[in-house]
């Protein structure tokens, strides 16, 4: 009986912890305007970690340039913002638009594969 309770508790805990990597934003996440997004990321670096453990970094230049990097990978291009989205084009990866939300000072972006990634902007 105790092992069943432990197993159920563990499964529920893991489901809660994995919620950020699901395809839906949490209800507390705030949709941002283009102006808010621009103010947050212009001239800044956003660092995050994909669900598979890959550390990623994006540098949003004040001139609209974008540099994206991960271990053994780098790409460059341009970025722009729309209400609730960061969009752009990278030389290797091509065009993209990621839904963007804010929560507790962190930036959350939904990748093309649906994964939601938490970024710290510095």
Protein language model regions, located:
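Lipid interaction determinants
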Residues: 2, 8, 17-122
